[in-house]
Amino acid sequence: MTLRVGVIGTGMIGQDHIRRLTQVLSAVEVVAVSDIDGARAAAVAPQGADVYAAAGDLIRSETVEAVVICSWGPAHEEQLLDCIAAGKPVFCEKPLVTTAAAALRVMEAEVAFGRRLVQVGFMRRFDADYRRLKATLDAGVLGAPLMFHSTHRNASVPEGLYTSDMPLNDTLVHDAYISRWLLNDEVTGVEVRVPRRSRRGGELRDPVVVLLHMGSGALVDVEISVNIAYGYDIRGEVSCEEGTASLPLRPATVIRDIHGVRQPVPADWRERFIEAYDQEFREWIVAAAQGTATGPSTWDGYAATLVADAALRAAESGALEPVRMCQRPSLYGPTLEAAR
């Protein structure tokens, strides 16, 4: 059985997902694309795929069984609600939506539908290294997790397109999600500290240090540096009661020659997480073919929005800003407190 997919948004990430769905993965076919730039959509559409000017028409098409949303964030709410109304599984790139109120509306619609349909594009949980780290923590051999040190470094970001809010409302959401998933815990408060600014970042608020207070009492510190020049460097170490567990450096190859010892650093997120992206979609295809979703949920997208909002407030106030979540609907499983 082949899942017939429509892709909304044909920018960089949309084109990468079209490539993945058409050239890398099996049991899936891209049968439709849509973009506000009709010429670009037509240029990247696979042979035989329909091109739609309006995303809603793609979603309602009888030939489309599932949808991938890669459009501009403010357009996500309407597109997600249309997918839920049509009963079609949907993969939505982050952000789920741009406001907590919008996240609640999407969540209410999905709960009313009665079955999970939405998966959000938090890909780190599909990375083999993160999965091994998660398995170690869940086994309990190191005792309870006490602290998680997360590092998120980019060589550079697009000048003029990446704003001072984006380390907190765009970059941070990956670290916030993976912290919740690894520790099986919710964020209850956020602090932000801004050290000396990097001269490479101009007027950007860069780097930043974020402290996430978790419901269990564990703490997560996140370093975000988006103009560090040398590459895309993702690190993580969990300190537990009886030891530590950390991610390996990637790629794992260590070179020794006349110049010394060195280890290459990935150039960007695609190089570091390409296998995670493939696995993310591999699992989504299986679930979508069954009419549902199993990966990061609307609840996770809602939580990420609240954490980002609190981080922006904390950057301005200098205080610990609370994260107040609504009661978790049973559709998204037990509360993390109950699961511990």
Swiss-Prot record:
One of its GO terms (molecular function) is nucleotide binding. The keyword Oxidoreductase applies. One of its GO terms (biological process) is inositol catabolic process. Its EC number is 1.1.1.18. The keyword Cell inner membrane does not apply. Gene3D superfamilies: Dihydrodipicolinate Reductase, domain 2, NAD(P)-binding Rossmann-like Domain. InterPro entries: Gfo-Idh-MocA_inositol_DH, Gfo/Idh/MocA-like_OxRdtase_N, GFO_IDH_MocA-like_dom, MI/DCI_dehydrogenase, NAD(P)-bd_dom_sf. Pfam families: GFO_IDH_MocA, GFO_IDH_MocA_C3. It catalyses: myo-inositol + NAD(+) = scyllo-inosose + NADH + H(+). It is an enzyme of class 1 (oxidoreductase). Keywords: NAD, Oxidoreductase. HAMAP family: IolG (MF_01671). Involved in the oxidation of myo-inositol (MI) to 2-keto-myo-inositol (2KMI or 2-inosose). Belongs to the Gfo/Idh/MocA family. Homotetramer. This is Inositol 2-dehydrogenase. It comes from Sinorhizobium fredii (strain NBRC 101917 / NGR234). The gene is iolG.
